[in-house]
Amino acid sequence: MMQPEKILGLIGRNIAYSRSPLIHNTACDLLALPYVYTIFNIASADLIEPAIAGARALGIAGLNVTTPYKTTVVPFLDELSPEAASIGAVNTIVNNNGHLAGYNTDIAGFAAPLRPYAQRIKGNPVSVFGNGGAALAAIEAFRIFFHPCCVYLFVRDSAKASAMLENYVHRDIVTLCLIEELFSGESGAIAKIQRSLVIVNATPIGTAGRQNETETSILPLDTELLHPDHIVYDMVYNPLFTPLIKAAKASGAATISGIEMLLGQAARSFELWTGKEMPLEQVRAVLINNLLSSP
């Protein structure tokens, strides 16, 4: 058996559910590459600096970064790619002999399945739910690739969202909106959703087994607002058919599953680390089979 020569991994909090190890280890096995991908659960933000220092010292070849640390890691890296610098969020770290470079592959990963709708999106409003790094990646992808007239960013905490946007150079395309206004029936908020061509869930709401007291619904919005002209994009990938995706299909809307972004960003990260193209369709088949067989 080939002994792993290089370590890859995912840092985040409460990430035992992640399918990233399945994706990357499958790809490495298919290509007979001497890498192993594992999970590094980081309990709190104050441990990020020593964790990054440890990765540097131990020669870990590369890392993915997920919620809630995509912005936290930035000060501890040596270099940022242009797309990571533009939103101040990193989801991929490459270790080149102790020099740590941060990238954001979420942007291209998010954009890929939306490309068939590019002409429809141009000049129309879109809505994004969330106030973390994934939401920022979606906003930047819309700006770079699709040119909507504006992005309605629906959040629960406007102060937190304002802080997130503070260093985002292109924040003028974003209009902050409160999710509570949707659920209370505020007409302006409802009109924004109805006018939006694309609706994106960039929150964990709908993730299998994750509902808690602060997420009283398994849906980010009242799905009665959905209509056949919408394109509904749920970044959640487990379950494969989330409550939002099911409701969107029932309304006649076009839908995009979270596995598309998951695989898109993973393929780019994999290429940055290994210099090889991920065997995407074979990995997709393994991932879908795993998700469908999960309880």
Swiss-Prot record:
Pathway: Metabolic intermediate biosynthesis; chorismate biosynthesis; chorismate from D-erythrose 4-phosphate and phosphoenolpyruvate: step 4/7. Signal peptide: none annotated. NADP(+) binds at G130, N131, G132, G133, A134, M235, G258. Its EC number is 1.1.1.25. Pfam families: SDH_C, Shikimate_dh_N. The active site is at K70. GO terms for molecular function: NADP binding; shikimate 3-dehydrogenase (NADP+) activity. GO terms for biological process: amino acid biosynthetic process; aromatic amino acid family biosynthetic process; chorismate biosynthetic process; shikimate metabolic process. Disulfide bonds: none annotated. PANTHER family: BIFUNCTIONAL 3-DEHYDROQUINATE DEHYDRATASE_SHIKIMATE DEHYDROGENASE, CHLOROPLASTIC, SHIKIMATE DEHYDROGENASE. Involved in the biosynthesis of the chorismate, which leads to the biosynthesis of aromatic amino acids. Catalyzes the reversible NADPH linked reduction of 3-dehydroshikimate (DHSA) to yield shikimate (SA). Belongs to the shikimate dehydrogenase family. This is Shikimate dehydrogenase (NADP(+)). It comes from Chlorobium phaeobacteroides (strain DSM 266 / SMG 266 / 2430). The gene is aroE.
